[in-house]
Curated annotation (Swiss-Prot):
Matching NCBIfam families: nadE, PRK00768.1
Pathway(s) served: Cofactor biosynthesis; NAD(+) biosynthesis; NAD(+) from deamido-NAD(+) (ammonia route): step 1/1
Residues that coordinate or bind ATP: 46-53, 160, 189, 211
Protein name: NH(3)-dependent NAD(+) synthetase
Organism: Citrobacter koseri (strain ATCC BAA-895 / CDC 4225-83 / SGSC4696)
Residues annotated as binding deamido-NAD(+): 140, 173, 180, 260-261
Gene Ontology CC: cytoplasm
InterPro entries: NAD/GMP_synthase, NAD_synthase, NH(3)-dep_NAD(+)_synth, Rossmann-like_a/b/a_fold
Enzyme class: ligase
Length: 276
């Protein structure tokens, strides 16, 4: 088995999908989880206005709405959480995403004060954060807020991770990568667009350039610039297509270097790290 085949298998990626079937699969997956643990009353998700959180949010709200109708349990809710650092650059996109999703409840938690307070506490301890590390601090603060909300609403935190993100490890460890349940896992980036199109999402929300927008020195840095490959490259790779060797090498390099992000904490029984 080639490394490409190993990766495709590990991430459950498929070369072709039926958008309607995958929408139903994700919605039913979320519903089944909540029905299995009836003490759970909410799905909690951070909404940025980008493709992944918009899609995940719509799936969450659909699942909750259907489950309420099926069970008569009005306590079930989907909570969309806005988590700006100060003023969000693409504020209108976030508003448009909220309008499309129509969440049961929208909360806004501005993380700037908490991030700056943490940075100052570290500075006083003699640790000066780089801009890159501060970016990860933002991602972790966002997740911290979501878990606090989930804890107070008997909920689970929903993630937006998908195959095109997982293969490169393009998420913050214990930040946006630290979630309870990931309904998009298996899909690549272009497949996510197919689902949003099928759901009637405004095109500008999934045709915009994806960005984590965590760095102050490089605001709205496109994911593709940070990764050194395009999402089309990554999607082609995950669909089993043959890529230029230099492109495949970059993708596989990201996969190997970030394997620890896709695992629970490393123990003496693990040996995957020996190949990195």
């Amino acid at each position: 088995m080639t490394l490409q085949q190993e990766i495709i298998r590990a991430l459950g990626a498929k070369p072709h999908i039926n958008a309607e079937e995958e929408i139903r699969r994700s919605v039913d997956f979320l519903k089944a989880y909540l029905k299995t643990y009836p003490f759970l009353k909410s799905l909690v998700l951070g909404i940025s206005g980008g493709q992944d959180s918009t899609l995940t949010g719509k799936l969450c709200q659909t699942a909750i709405t259907e489950l309420r109708e099926e069970t008569g349990n009005d306590a079930l809710q989907f909570i969309a959480v806005r988590l700006p650092f100060g003023v969000q650059a693409d504020e209108q996109d976030c508003q448009d995403a909220i309008a499309f999703i129509q969440p049961d409840r929208v909360l806004t938690v501005n993380i700037k004060g908490a991030v700056l307070a943490s940075e100052q506490a570290l500075r006083e301890a003699g640790i000066e954060l780089s801009d890159f590390v501060r970016g990860n601090e933002k991602a972790r603060e966002r997740m911290k807020a979501q878990y606090s909300i989930a804890g107070m609403t008997n909920g689970v935190v929903v993630g937006t991770d998908h195959a095109a993100e997982a293969v490169t490890g393009f998420f913050t460890k214990y930040g946006d990568g630290g979630t309870d349940i990931n309904p998009l896992f298996r899909l690549n980036k272009r497949q996510g667009k197919q689902l949003l199109a099928a759901l009637g999402c405004p095109e500008h929300l999934y045709k915009k350039a994806p960005t984590a927008d965590l760095e102050d020195d490089r605001p709205s840095l496109p994911d593709e610039a940070a990764l050194g490959v395009t999402y089309d490259n990554i999607d082609d790779y995950l669909e089993g297509k043959t890529l230029d060797a230099s492109i495949a090498k970059i993708i596989e390099g990201w996969y190997i270097r970030t394997e620890h992000k896709r695992r629970t904490p490393i123990t003496v029984f693990d040996d995957f790290w020996k190949r990195s």
